Amino acid sequence: MENFFSKNYWSVGFQSRLYDHLSPESYFESMQKVVAGLPDGNSLSLLDAGCGSGLLLRFLADRIKEGMIYTGMDLLDSGVEATRQRAEELGIAERVTCVQSDLASPLPVDAVKYDVVVGHFSLYTLASDELRKFALENLKSVMQPEGLLVLVNPSVNYDANLIIEQSIQLVGERYGPLVAFFKQYLVYPFTKAIGLRFIQKQLRLGIWKAYSREEFTQEFERAGFEVQHVEEVYAGSAFWGIGRQVAN
C-alpha cells in the first residue's frame, strides 16, 4: 500500500482534486509571493514548469486576462488535464497552453522563448544533482536572453507542524475564525497526515531534495543565473528565489 501511495501520490491528488482541497494556506501564500515578484508587462510569456493541477492560475488569472501568455507543463496527464480544466473554469483557456513533458527531457516548446520560467515545488522531486542540472539546462534553453527563473523548493528545515500552524494563522487573518476552525479540525489533519508528512519523509530519506540556503543559491549560479532574490517562505520550510539569466 505504501509503495502504491509513493508511486501515485501526485496523480491521485490531481485526479481527485484532493491536492487542491488539502493544500495549506501557507502554500498559496508562497504562490502569491511568486506572482507578486513577477515583472510588469501585459505581454509577458511564462512557463509553469511542473504546473501540477494548475493552482498557480488562480493567482495569475488577472494577468493572463490582461495579456500574459501562459504555458503549463507537467509530467502527468492528470496534471495537464486538471490545468486545462482550471483554465476553462477561470475563463482564460484561450491564453493557456498545456503540454506534457518530463523536466529532465528535451522540452516540447523549443520554438517559444519565455520571459519567465517558474518552478514552484517541482525541481526538488529530481533527487540527483545531475538530473536537476539537466532540467535547468532544458529550462534555460527555452528562455529569452536575460529571462527570469523563479524557483520555490523545500529547505532542510521542512516542518509539517510549522506549515500547518502558519496556515491556520493565515486563514484566520484572511477569512475569519470560523473558517480557521474548519480548516484546523476538519481539513488540515488530513493535509498533514497524507500530504505534508509524506513529503517530509521523502525529503529526509533523500528521495527528494531538501536545500540549504547555500545549495539553493549555488544551483542558480551553476546553471548560469545571477541570483537577485532569496527568501524563506512556507513557514521557513522552503526557499523562494529569483535568478536572471546571465548574458553570454
Identify the residue ranges that each predicted region occupies:
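Conserved SAM/SAH-binding beta-strand->alpha-helix loop
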Residues: 76
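Short alpha-helix
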Residues: 207-223
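Conserved class I S-adenosyl-L-methionine
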Residues: 1-40, 55-59, 150-179
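Conserved SAM-binding loop
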Residues: 83-84
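A short glycine-rich, Lys/Arg-flanked "PGG" loop and its adjoining helix->strand segment in the class I
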Residues: 133-145
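A short acidic, Gly/Pro-enriched loop at the edge of an enzyme's catalytic core
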Residues: 108-117
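Conserved SAM-binding strand-loop segment of SAM-dependent methyltransferases
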Residues: 91-105
